[in-house]
Amino acid sequence: MKRILGIILFTALIISCFTVCKKSGIQKDYPFQPIPFTEVRITDQYWSARLETNQKVTISYAFQQCEETGRIQNFEEAAAVKSGKKERGTFSSVYPFDDSDVYKVIEGASYSLSVHPDPELEKYLDDLIAKIAAAQEDDGYLYTARTINSDPPVRWVEKERWGNMYLGHELYNAGHMYEAAVAHYLATGKRNFLDVALKNADLIASVFGPGKSHGAPGHQEIEIGLVKLYRVTRVRKYLNLAKFFLDERGNSTDRKLFGEYSQDHLPVIEQSEAVGHAVRAAYMYSGMADVAALTGDSSYIQAIDRIWEDVVQGKIYVTGGIGATGAGEAFGGDYNLPNATAYAETCAAIGNALWNQRMFLLHGDAKYIDVLERVLYNGLISGVALTGKLFFYTNPLESYGQHQRSPWFSCACCPSNISRFMPSVPGYVYAQRDDTLYVNLFIDSQVKVDLKGHQVNIQQETEYPWEGSVKITVDPEEPGEFAVFVRIPGWTQNQPIPSNLYQYLSRSEEKAVLKVNGEQTDFNLDKGYARIRRTWNKGDAVELDFPMPVRRVISHPEVKENIGKVALERGPLVYCAEWPDNQGNVSNLALPNGTELKAEHRENMFDSITVIKGQVQALHQGKNENETITTQQEFMAIPYYAWAHRGQGEMAVWLPRQESLARALPKPSIASTSQVSVSRDKNGSAVNDQWEPKNSNDHSHPYLHWWPTKGTMEWVQYDFKKPEIVSAVEVYWFDDTGRGECRVPVSWRALYRKNGEWIPVVNKGSYGVEKDTYNRVTFEPIQTTGLRLEIQLQEKFSAGIHEWKVHLYGVRLP
């Protein structure tokens, strides 16, 4: 009974935001309304497993990490200072925005409680919320990094409140608190967290606004949270404050602008391009959509329409990821979409999904769901391992073995974001407007909807994303006329994305087939939807068949990294080639246009997947460096989201279409077969991976670095498989001048192992520290089982190495 009452409360309050708003003081809202996730029961194998893992593993694991990393202790410390038990506390984590991770996991746990009652979890939340409430200052201020008053102070935290709007994250933390508090209230009916949030929001509303302090949050998020407070309370000042913060961006009358990084370079209604920090941007665009829907401000809609076009035209990865560069975690310029260095942050993927859902709710156009589906099945779900305990912060489209999922991060925004997003996935499946049901995603599910007085049970049966057959049973309690609009995905219409950024190499003549009660029905598309309006009776069924051939994708020619390359798709899934399936390497493979590719289902891989099989050309270096040997080789690709579950190695989404673009696999060398060890337990695998750098500042391939260590003596060591006679080494230095803090070293020397000791070699020349070239030193031949380089770093800088080669005595040097 308690579960039923909880679901009723959650559903009623969410639906009230859309269906009874005029009676409650809300005059406007989104014209298209999502069916709440609490109403949708997911029954398919693919999503059920992921949702269950999030519920049973990820949420509790994230709370555990918040405890172990001091995030929860921060609230306890702040409470101790506030109560007078301590004069100063100790900030126990790293960043002032760490409070937000706790809030996000609470939000995810609350969503989980809405559909999976758990008294133990509910009690844990009550205890945690009590700690948060105890940390709140008397006037509502809640920001542990300042209340703790730690010595030394936390980075970015100024002496006075709101003193560092650019990086302080006070308002960012508050926004996530509001979202979590609303979720908890809707799930449990308890006000213990909501009252904390409202007290804080009232304080902020008393400080900021017209005639008060003028400022824009450095990191957008509070706007979304304020809108959710408004929806629950109907208190207009929260909506007004959200709009105020948006309108303050680009307004230099009372303050210095933060610039493009924070989308603070222009007023939001004048912005047309996606620039700066990608997560900040996506949250801002989502907040603008919310405020536009609730206020009717068409200038907001016009702006985010322009920005959306800018993104899909040249700033989105084929996986749906956004934010190309790690410099500022930001959007790059048009068509700047590198693969190996792609940032594509998991939080940005989540933000992209949130934004595109809102764009659909504004416009009712399937193109937004096409983008949402792309990111959901590819660049977002890749951010969490199948186990639910390992995470990607960034989601590159190419790897040389330097990437692996992490159990947590010092900046843990992505794992906590995953924990709150996953339970909401069922809420993206269906939507409605008046008497029309929109079927947006194809997931085996059940839902009951009220279509303008028609009570209708919907059951969707499908093995999507592996198979394209979908059956939707429409079961009204009484016969009646209403409409069902079914999205026909863009990928079935030879359009992978709603622009010319990506295209299929060849058109498919296979078309989606629609049947109603077994009879094939012609359909015209209305904004990407097949429209079916009729008098429905119990047991009526809509059947769809989406052909799922393997498709080759090519990029716009301005995407320089993808020239001459192809990506593989099947249905909504983007595929990648990974080393375990392709004889240990991927970079030496070429996939000619005419190669036959076929899909093959594997029940025993990654909880059941469909792979792509075929033949490729494999390139290997011949007897000398200028000779290339090409052979035919079996090829297999797996869904992109499933990579990096079997250890570190090569992976690529984009594959060369001709041999000239593939890398001939070098012959093993004394260096490449050596065991590498490095001071400070650094991973040294990059120094002998045989990838040739373009220059010292090349970030496209792995490199060894000692940053943030500066001014010290460091070392890197090779242990040979057997004693070798060697007479020369070459080092290619990493130097990221203009981007980071690594420089060529002051000096270095080579040593060899003799009787367990390291002895300097007798060198015949100087030890070079030149950039953009190999620095070779020859020495008297020695027989040894290992070499070591000792490297003296510059006083205020770190250092790094791209490649370290070793030459055998008697072998002619190149």
Locate the predicted segments by residue.
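Bacterial Sec-dependent N-terminal signal peptides
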Residues: 1-25
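Aromatic (Trp/Tyr) and acidic
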Residues: 26-119, 123, 153-187, 220-237, ...
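Asp-box/WD-like beta-propeller blade repeats and closely related beta-sheet repeat scaffolds
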Residues: 148-168, 194, 199-217
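Short, surface-exposed beta-strand/strand-loop-strand elements in extracellular ectodomains
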Residues: 172, 497-506, 510-516, 739-755
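Flexible glycine/proline-rich, aromatic-decorated loop/lid segments
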Residues: 258-261, 316-334
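C-terminal beta-rich recognition modules with glycine/proline-rich loops and embedded aromatic residues
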Residues: 304, 370-378, 383-473, 493-516, ...
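Non-cytosolic beta-sheet module surface loops
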Residues: 462, 474-478, 488-490, 534, ...
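Aromatic, loop-rich ligand-recognition surfaces of beta-strand-rich domains
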Residues: 662-663, 697-814
